[in-house]
């Protein structure tokens, strides 16, 4: 599993760095757990102000450490890796690498929750058919009329749908322009 992670992560890092037009400072560290329960019991990052969780709430990020678990599904594992890599890159891109830079930048940069979560989810999963169906259901069945209402119901899906639209309409090169 560690060898698989190394091979996949190398390709995914290059792919995501190209999408964001940004090279990571330093190295990634991947901590892999054999199952979800081991992952949930981990105390890595507890008490750290630097602890983030991604959109699924399951990939922990501590600095450049990405904590993931393997549940028997390589597709899901790869999504966790991509989400973790995207989160680390976005954190470095927006807030800098050191704790001091992050504190200084956090006061200046304030993106809505759906914006970053949607981007991370889009990078990790793309726009699968079930998202299309879920969005259609919210609009038709639940009567969601506009983007703000969608953000209230499902902010991650709202952000993911926005990034899907932007990339489909204007191309992947626009991602870095909208983040900087």
Regions found by a protein language model. Give the residues of each.
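Juxtacatalytic substrate-recognition/specificity segment
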Residues: 1-106, 112, 129-130
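Active-site-proximal alpha-helical
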Residues: 16, 111-132, 136-180
């Amino acid at each position: 599993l560690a060898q698989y992670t190394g091979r996949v992560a190398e390709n995914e890092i290059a792919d995501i760095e190209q999408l964001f037009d940004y090279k990571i400072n330093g190295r990634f560290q991947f901590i892999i757990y054999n199952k979800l329960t081991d992952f949930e019991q981990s105390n890595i990052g507890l008490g750290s102000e630097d602890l983030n969780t991604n959109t699924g709430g399951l990939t922990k990020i501590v600095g450049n450490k990405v904590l993931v678990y393997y549940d028997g599904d390589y597709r899901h594992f790869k999504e966790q890796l991509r989400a973790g890599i995207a989160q680390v890159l976005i954190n470095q891109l927006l807030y800098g690498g050191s704790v001091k830079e992050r504190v200084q930048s956090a006061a200046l940069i304030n993106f809505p929750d759906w914006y970053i979560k949607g981007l991370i989810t889009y990078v990790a999963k793309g726009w699968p058919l079930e998202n299309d169906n879920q969005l259609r259901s919210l609009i038709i069945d639940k009567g969601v009329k506009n983007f703000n209402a969608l953000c209230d119901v499902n902010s991650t899906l709202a952000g993911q749908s926005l990034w899907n639209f932007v990339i489909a309409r204007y191309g992947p090169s626009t991602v870095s322009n909208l983040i900087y």
